[in-house]
Structures are given as structure tokens and as C-alpha cells.
Amino acid sequence: MQLSDPLGDLLTRIRNAQRSRHATCVSPASKLRANVLEALKREGYIRGYTSEELRPGISQLRVELKYNDGEPVIKEITRVSKPGRRVYSKIKELPRVYAGLGVSILSTPRGVLSDNEARAANVGGEVLCRVF
């Protein structure tokens, strides 16, 4: 089955797994998904992720979810830029998520970065999602 929004599918899988208190969730692999997961790992929202090859040419990502005293670390994870409506932001116009308590994940010319990393690198880009 072809997905129209693979990144939205990953975010929904993470959201549903955390609501069900699962330790891990599985998603089909892609470079964009792996880069977003790497940004979430750097920001401390997930424990990590691994790539598993099911058969030659077909891989999946196993995401290790993070909990704090039994509560999910990710309270809210939403898609901002969608296939039908792309959202781009200059770094000066990028709003802070919950007054800096959350992060935005951006696709920039320097790769997929959190809003804090993008501000430090002084680059804007497509706002992929918000995490709190």
C-alpha cells in the first residue's frame, strides 16, 4: 500500500504506541524518517531507534519510546507541513513551541534539525512537525 504522507504515518504510530504504553513501535524505513528520529533522539524525546532488514531492499525502523515515571515523554506530536500544504519558515520567523518547552523539527539545507539547532546554524526550512 502506498502512503500519501509517510512522515505523518510515523508520527501517528509513535503517538498511538505511547498512548498504549508500548515500549517500542515499528515503522517502514526511509531516510527522512530516520533523520527525524535522529533529531528526536538528540532532543531526548526517544531512547533510540534501530534499522532492521526484513528482506533484501525492505527495512523497518524500531523506535524505542521513552517514559518518565510511567508517563510518555512526548505529550504532543503533530505534523505541521503536510503534502497538501507545505509550511516554510525563515529562522527569524520560527515561533517557539510552548515558549521553548517543546521543539519544532525542520528540514533544512543542512539536514533535519531541531529548531534550537537551526537557530544555532542560522538556517530556516520546511517545518515538519512540533513535539512537546
Swiss-Prot record:
The keyword Transferase does not apply. The keyword Ribosomal protein applies. One of its GO terms (biological process) is translation. GO terms for cellular component: ribonucleoprotein complex; ribosome. Belongs to the universal ribosomal protein uS8 family. NCBIfam families: PRK00136.1. One of the primary rRNA binding proteins, it binds directly to 16S rRNA central domain where it helps coordinate assembly of the platform of the 30S subunit. This is Small ribosomal subunit protein uS8. It comes from Granulibacter bethesdensis (strain ATCC BAA-1260 / CGDNIH1). The gene is rpsH.
